[in-house]
Amino acid sequence: MEMFERFNTLVGEVIGCNSHGCYVRDDETDKVVFYYGCGQRGDRVQLTVKKVNLETEQVTCVLDAVLSYAA
């Protein structure tokens, strides 16, 4: 989790969504992060890290760009 504090952007694939946002598996660390916003499973996205909670190991992000849409 400390790794997310050093980087402010990450790239990954959407693995699931709910009514609030989407869960993304980070390509570099293989960790799952959350962003508030719309998406679809399989989308490739770039995110900006907004908050890292080391106690609960939660990373909250915002969507920067959709790199590719799910097929």
What does each of the following model-derived ranges do?
Residues 1-71:
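Single-stranded RNA-binding regions, centering on S1/OB-family and related RNA-binding modules
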